């Protein structure tokens, strides 16, 4: 059966997107831990459907607002977790464990800046997916959605392209601020990040769904500007902390005004 619509849910610190079909549902990203109740409540109370209709949760990458709810959603609904085919965990080793703690701390900071109530954000540093996918694969049970490997923010970022409508979910590839688009923090690999932007531009999507922002049509000129202004050097976790906590005059805005 064909897609009915895509619902944007106002998650804890990000937008979450739910693909609604007559007989099944797919969550385009795992969200934060507190988003589990939001998603299940929407399915039960707004859609008036059993939570078992949630068949797939995609995890585009391992940050707290994209992977934090995945395991709990699977426990509650029996859904499949689908993620990138990587041999190693993003948060591997001692350094990875430290980075996991830092990322959770940064998520708490963003939540505070957005005026969100303090809540638990802890989730496993290691994802245990049911299925893994690569570039050009389709999502199991949802073959109208094509997987795009769009790394750069991390080493395993996925985007999801709905083939019939040409809508694309890009997770953290592009961040929408009030009046402009910017690159995310961190940037794991600037070169492949630019290639990922070009890949999405070349699709000529009808609509771009962003985890930080909303869904918008982005024209070729805007993509070209994003590519031209993309970081030329890595943005490390140290840079990310500075960006969150300090005044970044070279970005042209104050974090006091920033809503992510």
Task: Spell out what each predicted region is.
Residues 232, 236-260:
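C-terminal regulatory/interaction regions
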């Amino acid at each position: 059966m064909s897609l009915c619509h895509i619902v944007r849910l106002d998650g804890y610190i990000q937008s979450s997107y739910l693909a609604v079909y007559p007989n099944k549902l797919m969550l385009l990203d795992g969200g934060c831990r507190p988003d589990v109740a939001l998603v299940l409540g929407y399915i039960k109370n707004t859609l008036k459907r059993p939570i078992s209709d949630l068949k797939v949760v995609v995890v585009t990458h391992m940050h707290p607002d994209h992977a934090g709810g995945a395991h709990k959603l699977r426990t509650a609904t029996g859904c499949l977790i689908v993620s990138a085919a990587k041999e190693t965990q993003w948060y591997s080793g001692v350094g990875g464990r430290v980075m996991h703690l830092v990322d959770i701390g940064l998520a708490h900071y963003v939540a505070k800046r957005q005026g969100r109530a303090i809540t638990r954000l802890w989730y496993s540093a290691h994802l245990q997916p049911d299925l893994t996918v690569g570039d050009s694969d389709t999502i199991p049970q949802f073959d109208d959605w094509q997987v795009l490997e769009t790394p750069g923010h991390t080493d395993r970022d996925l985007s999801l392209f709905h083939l019939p409508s040409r809508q694309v979910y890009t997770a953290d590839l592009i961040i929408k601020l009030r009046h402009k688009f910017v690159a995310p923090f961190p940037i794991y690999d600037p070169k492949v990040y630019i290639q990922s932007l070009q890949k999405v531009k070349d699709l000529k999507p009808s609509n771009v769904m962003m985890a930080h922002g909303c869904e918008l049509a982005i024209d070729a000129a805007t993509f070209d500007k994003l590519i031209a202004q993309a970081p030329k050097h890595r943005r490390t976790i140290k840079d990310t902390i500075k960006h969150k906590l300090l005044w970044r005059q070279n970005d042209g805005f104050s974090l006091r005004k920033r809503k992510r």
